[in-house]
């Protein structure tokens, strides 16, 4: 292994620079303009985005970010930086940088830092365990666009997914077990993944299959009845059908059916963010309690836990040692 020539670019979705409407508007404009995310004709979509969605949605989303913002910034950025720092300490001669698909630090910034250190073999590691065209696919597009401006490009190893990597499953199982020990075993364990339009699956996206792989591996390794494990999908946007069952509707239903205790984990989120800390830990808690439930716990993302860093290190070393 020639350590000096390798470099790692960790990539996550991104975050606004500040929990203020203007910053949120800039971030959402970039995010929702990506055809991988919203694949509607720009002639139709741009007037709706800039004339309706951004003016009305940005102030509302900014208020939500204000509720979860940390002293050092957005939770997603804080935890992603911590992952980068911890991972860099595992390698003596392999630089590790961070880039966001949308917002800052940008993909360009992360790649530029690596190339300035003489990297010739680039490992791009999107922090999305399950592949989707709207996440990992968007990262690939972003890297490809940057390569178009370069006379000499580095060799590329792109990590498409790690939905059933043994260390990933182990880390999730241990997080769930820790929650069980602290709060007791729930009546239901809900595995909530980010949703995507059903249309994406029908046209070839493997995301649903990869979510199922993760769920089946967890069922096999958890000391918990498989029939009490539920897979749901959150964060739907727009009017077309998305992957179901929907997390929010499931919470309402469970509460109304007499289920008293649920615990929720979001296996597809490598870092806690707005969708986990506010949508799952706050909104869906209310749905469950108001529906009649009594006890609700959110199990945090893997964030910068040692077991998560062990996983990322193993993925990288496996590539470098081939």
From Swiss-Prot:
Keyword tags: Cytoplasm, Heme biosynthesis, Iron, Lyase, Metal-binding, Porphyrin biosynthesis
Tagged with keyword Iron: yes
Species annotation: Proteus mirabilis (strain HI4320)
PANTHER family tied to this protein: FERROCHELATASE (PTHR11108), FERROCHELATASE, MITOCHONDRIAL (PTHR11108:SF1)
Catalytic activity: heme b + 2 H(+) = protoporphyrin IX + Fe(2+)
Gene3D superfamilies per the UniProt record, alphabetical: 3.40.50.1400
Protein encoded by which gene: hemH
Pfam family, one: Ferrochelatase
General function of this protein: Catalyzes the ferrous insertion into protoporphyrin IX.
GO molecular function, one term: ferrochelatase activity
Protein's pathway: Porphyrin-containing compound metabolism; protoheme biosynthesis; protoheme from protoporphyrin-IX: step 1/1
Designated name of the protein: Ferrochelatase
Homology family: Belongs to the ferrochelatase family.
GO BP annotation list: heme biosynthetic process
């Amino acid at each position: 292994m020639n350590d000096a020539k390798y470099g790692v670019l960790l990539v996550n979705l991104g975050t606004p620079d500040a929990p203020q409407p203007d910053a949120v508007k800039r971030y959402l404009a970039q995010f929702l303009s990506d055809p991988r995310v919203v694949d509607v004709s720009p002639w139709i979509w741009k007037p709706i985005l800039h004339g309706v969605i951004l003016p009305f949605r940005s102030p509302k989303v900014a208020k939500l970010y204000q509720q979860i913002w940390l002293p050092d910034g957005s939770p997603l950025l804080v935890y992603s930086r911590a992952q980068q720092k911890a991972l860099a300490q595992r390698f003596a001669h392999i630089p590790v940088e961070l880039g966001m698909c949308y917002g800052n630090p940008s993909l360009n910034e992360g790649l530029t830092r690596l190339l300035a250190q003489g990297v010739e073999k680039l490992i791009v590691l999107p922090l999305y365990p399950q592949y989707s065209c709207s996440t990992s696919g968007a990262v690939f597009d972003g890297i490809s666009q940057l390569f178009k401006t370069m006379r000499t490009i580095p060799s590329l190893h792109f990590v498409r997914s790690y939905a059933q990597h043994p260390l990933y499953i182990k880390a999730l199982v241990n997080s769930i077990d820790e929650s069980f020990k602290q709060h007791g075993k729930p009546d239901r364990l809900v595995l909530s993944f980010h949703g995507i339009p059903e249309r994406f699956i029908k046209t070839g996206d493997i995301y649903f299959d990869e979510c199922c792989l993760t769920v089946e591996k967890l069922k096999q390794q958890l000391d918990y009845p498989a029939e009490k494990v539920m897979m749901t999908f959150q964060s739907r946007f727009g009017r077309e059908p998305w992957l179901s069952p929907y997390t929010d509707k499931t919470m309402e239903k469970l509460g109304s059916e007499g289920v008293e205790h649920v615990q929720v984990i979001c296996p597809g989120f490598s870092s806690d963010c707005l969708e986990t800390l506010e949508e799952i830990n706050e909104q869906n808690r209310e749905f469950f309690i108001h529906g009649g439930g009594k006890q609700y716990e959110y199990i945090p993302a893997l964030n910068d836990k040692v077991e998560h860093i062990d996983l990322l290190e193993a993925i990288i070393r496996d590539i470098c040692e081939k």
